[in-house]
Amino acid sequence: MTSTIVQICRDCRSTLGEKRARCPHCGSPRLFAHPEWDKLAIAHVDCDAFYATIEKRDDPSLMAKPVIIGGGRRGVVSTACYIARIHGVHSAMPMFKARAACPNGVIIKPNMEKYVKVSREVRQLMLELTPLVEPVSIDEAFLDLSGTQALHGTPPSLTLMRFSEKVEKEIGVTVSIGLSFNKFLAKIASDLDKPRGFSAIGEAEALDFLGPKPVTILPGVGKAAAARFGREGVSTVLDLRRLEPRRMVSLLGNDGMRLTRLANARDDRRVTPEHETKSVSAETTFETDTRDAEVLLPILMHLSEKVSARMKTSEFGGSTITLKLKTSDFRLVTRSRTVSAPTNLAGRIYQAARALMQPELARGPYRLIGVGVSELVPAEEADRGDLADQSVAREAGMERAVDSLRARFGQGAITRGLVFAARQTGDKGRR
């Protein structure tokens, strides 16, 4: 095959010799064209509104309704379907704001055991394409399909189109795929055409593509960083490229050099298979800097749930919990502690992270919060407990029992008291 092809139908994968609005073979309007279609091999696969899509799959009566996954007035949104997003609901939004923005929304408490099971099914299909699969979270991963054309008989782009169709037909969820020559641009490409998207950013176009984009397209640049750049006369990626590297370092430290590389479409990170993974983490950047425990602690619980879900999906436990904070002046604060036994339970991750957070609350405000687990071990070595510390075994048993009851009787059968506990200052973070 050569790169002279104009269009490929994403549904029947016919190759079309001239530009058309629809495929003449199957009538689909989902046509893909790119001059580097047979060369690009780094992909980012992102499941569309993953939790909400699973709930709609399992209850078709929800299909046309705005579904919001989350719970408790003081909790945060885990996922919102695309209908709810039209009303302004988004991930990590406080639930009371989500209810106000979308009063007709159907609120469903997350069923992590179910979501982890589906995530593993999707991951297994990824591994049929390439062993180089790097999970990013429960619903997204990077894949490196370099050298797989001999195995599959097609370039990565066509292989990924077949994969997308297979996931939708066999598992009942949809994915958006970004294809490029590095991870940074593959991630951006996957966001260009959601849901059920398939987009590519090639090497020849990368600088021109990025140039006019706002600096917020770069990972880690939120409103506060954008405002700081604005004071330097920088609003676009092209503006940022024109800043002297020395000035970037003075503004943002090591982050400045990282952003300079990304602004120039350079990203040397490899796709790292999960057996090489050293840590599992999740983080979020706030629209407004805050030191308010009423805001920070529920989000800390949300992030702990995300890390726990990914660890269970990847079958890891870990013994070192790390809290990551970034101040309003971009100073990075990290605090770590080692727990008594490796864990992948959300409650234990949250307890450790919350203890690390308490002394830092007065030192904010913060623009970013993150939680990570490292010193990874196989999942069967996690949460065993021992004779010297029976509380570990009891806590692990309680959380597993809750997971089991929720799997049998629904997520509402038992409600975790962590969000209530987040309002306290002297408890153990659980009820």
Task: Locate the predicted segments by residue.
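Short, charged/polar surface micro-motifs in flexible loops or helix N-caps
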Residues: 48-50, 73-75, 328-331, 376-379
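Acidic, metal-coordinating catalytic segment for phosphate/diphosphate chemistry
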Residues: 341-431
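Gly/Gly-Pro- and Ser/Thr-rich, intrinsically disordered tail segments characteristic of DNA damage-repair
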Residues: 1-261, 271, 309, 392-431
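Residue-level signal for secondary-structure boundary sites
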Residues: 151, 185, 331, 379-381
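A glycine-rich phosphate-binding loop feature that marks nucleotide/adenosyl-phosphate handling sites
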Residues: 180-184, 262-265, 317-328, 366-377, ...
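DNA-contacting surface of Y-family translesion DNA polymerases
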Residues: 1-6, 35-36, 44, 210, ...
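Short aromatic/hydrophobic contact patches that present stacked aromatics
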Residues: 106, 142, 322, 338, ...
